[in-house]
């Protein structure tokens, strides 16, 4: 456990009753996080019940609900070619009209929401978990910190879209490339966040006392580092969701994302961009959904950040 402290504590108080020499993992002075780790998350979840947090939760909730119920709500199969006219405007049968190959735009948007959410809700947590694990190891310092920092620097040197184009050239377009781009983009973000938390918490007096008393690295990480990292993780997770929505939409818009005929919001927006004058809702529909989803996650992130400052 010597890695967690850079100096030995040899103060006279160490020999006094109640001093660091008497401390054991079960006797370390309690902190708010020690008394109830859930307290770290309560302000965050309460922020979703009012103001910006509530507005963001409602927006994200509506889009998620539409995506979850897409197979039920979609009036037609997403790739079904209909008997109606090409690029038909909105009407009672086709609320958002039809596209350039005579498919119902509303059905494709609903199924596109579902595809996008599956990608985002899978890729971001995977990137967060991998980045957090690397950040925990790096925060203990040693050669692992240097290696992790250099890896983070290399990844961050490439803008997300440049990284997407490079990976697509190797792997080909598709869901696998999108997921990998999002995961790689999030690893250094969460890695540096957790590393900073570890470096900050390890210098606190009660953590140093626990280390001197013989507490293991795992115990210190579990009791002190992780509870104190929940709030910044929540803020970054919400923000990363909005970034991931943009990355997926941009990749599909450029034709290097979800492969047709599978619908995605970015690919529908790309197709509709060519027919703005004929059927503007062809492009406006997916654009509104992407905007609402991104705005919702941003509002949640801002609400979480405000709750941390209270």
Predicted features and spans:
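Transmembrane alpha-helix signature in integral membrane proteins
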Residues: 105-137
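Glycine-rich helix-loop "coupling/hinge" segments at transmembrane-helix boundaries
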Residues: 156, 167-170, 197-198, 247-290, ...
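Short helix-to-coil transition segments within interhelical loops
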Residues: 98-103, 141, 155, 209-228, ...
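C-terminal transmembrane helix and the adjacent membrane-cytosol boundary/short C-terminal tail
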Residues: 185, 231, 238-239, 280-310
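Non-cytoplasmic
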Residues: 162-166, 174-186, 233-268
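Short hydrophobic alpha-helical segments within the ABC transporter permease transmembrane module
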Residues: 105-109, 117, 151, 194, ...
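Transmembrane alpha-helical segments of polytopic membrane transport and secretion proteins
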Residues: 1-61, 298-310
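Generic hydrophobic transmembrane alpha-helix motif, especially the helices
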Residues: 95, 99, 136-140, 144-200, ...
């Amino acid at each position: 456990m010597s890695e967690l402290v850079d100096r030995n504590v040899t103060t006279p108080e160490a020999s006094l009753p109640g001093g660091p020499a008497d401390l054991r993992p079960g006797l370390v002075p309690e902190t708010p996080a020690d008394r109830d780790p859930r307290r770290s998350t309560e302000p965050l979840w309460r922020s979703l019940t009012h103001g910006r947090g509530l507005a963001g939760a409602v927006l994200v909730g509506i889009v998620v609900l539409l995506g979850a119920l897409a197979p039920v709500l979609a009036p037609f199969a997403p790739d079904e070619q209909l008997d109606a006219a090409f690029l038909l405007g909105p009407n009672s049968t086709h609320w958002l009209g039809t596209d350039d190959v005579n498919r119902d735009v509303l059905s494709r948007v609903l199924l596109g929401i579902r595809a996008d959410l599956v990608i985002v809700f899978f890729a971001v947590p995977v990137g967060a978990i991998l980045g957090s694990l690397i950040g925990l190891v790096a925060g203990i310092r040693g050669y692992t910190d240097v290696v992790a920092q250099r890896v983070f620097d290399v990844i961050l040197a490439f803008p997300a879209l440049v990284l997407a184009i490079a990976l697509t050239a190797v792997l080909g377009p598709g869901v696998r490339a999108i997921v990998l781009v999002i995961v790689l983009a999030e690893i250094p973000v969460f890695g540096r966040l957790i590393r900073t938390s570890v470096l900050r918490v390890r210098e606190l007096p009660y953590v140093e006392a626990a280390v001197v008393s013989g507490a293991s690295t795992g115990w210190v990480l579990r009791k002190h580092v992780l509870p104190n990292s929940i709030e910044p993780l929540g803020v970054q997770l919400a923000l990363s969701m909005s970034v991931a929505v943009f990355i997926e939409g941009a990749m599909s818009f450029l034709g290097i994302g979800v492969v047709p005929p599978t619908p995605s919001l970015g690919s529908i927006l790309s197709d509709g961009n060519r027919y703005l004058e004929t059927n503007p809702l062809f492009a406006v529909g997916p654009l509104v959904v992407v905007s609402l989803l991104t705005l919702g996650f941003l509002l949640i992130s801002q609400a979480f950040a405000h709750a941390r400052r209270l």
